[in-house]
Amino acid sequence: MPNFMVEKDEAGLALIDFLQRKIPAAPASYLKQLVKKGKVCGRSGVLTADSPLLIGEQIHLPESGRLQEFLAARPMESRPLQVLYESREILVVDKPAAPAIHSSRGHEQDNLTARVEALLQQRGSKFKVAPVHRLDLETSGPVLFGKGRKACGELGPLFMRREVEKYYLALVAGKTAGRGRLESPVTAKGKRKAACTDFRALERNEQASLLELELHTGRQHQIRQQLAEQGHPLFGDNRYRGPCPPGLPRMFLHCSRLVFVDPFSGAPLAIDAPLPEELALFLSQVGFGNSCYSERIE
């Protein structure tokens, strides 16, 4: 059974923040589910998110194949940042799952923006960079940064005007239709908002379907909500009750391609991000190969 001792500088931390320190490869949503289900214990028994942590206390976690994979994984900050495209005004990097894009609670030091800033500092660049769109914490794929205020001012409106084509790969439970359009509204900030997603099945069997999806709107958790409502939640998605088998260390959702016109040069750009190794390896467990990822929705 994995266990950790609370050190002097960790006393008083929120339980989730403590666990993120100890298991940096684990998504916050996964750790929150462990706590919510009563799987994390201390000297007083089952711990809640509000339980105070005391110096010297032993924190016990359950035996779990998925947890062991997180514990064995390299910390995210030790993995080199992959640059997918760069010009004078634009930098596109391949975001792994887990790090937040911006500084936020639990991600003050290690977040994607901080990594990009560190990369440019190493080069001696003095550009002030900022991301111009977002990906959910557990989603991997290309993130577009503008170099300087003027570049950000030109790039941000591309997403607001929906001039960027966004493609995703997702593995979902069950056998879906071969292709279709999802138009059910999604809940965002307490309100139901219109959402539109096209999908095509790249591989299917009775257990699972590998889908390529194109987003026409950019609602938070759009793909996850719409597919779960159809009875096909994503593999690894605790929040929407997707299957979470031991061999899958994260949610199976990856942004695979961004297509847009460079507002500075006028050149058309198609930026592809390869399927992360941990997702590609898992596909064989559900009987799928890897020969179809380059196909696009027509």
What kind of feature is each model-predicted range?
Residues 1-193, 278-286, 293:
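RNA pseudouridine synthases
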Residues 1-33, 79-81, 203-208, 216, ...:
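Pseudouridine synthases involved in rRNA/tRNA modification
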Residues 64-66, 194, 238-244:
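Short Pro/Gly-enriched beta-strand edge/turn motifs at strand-loop
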Residues 91, 168, 209-211, 254-256:
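Short beta-strand micro-motifs in enzyme catalytic cores
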Residues 155, 219-227:
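Short beta-strand segments enriched for Tyr within beta-sheet-rich domains
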Residues 199:
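Long C-terminal interaction/binding lobes of large macromolecular proteins
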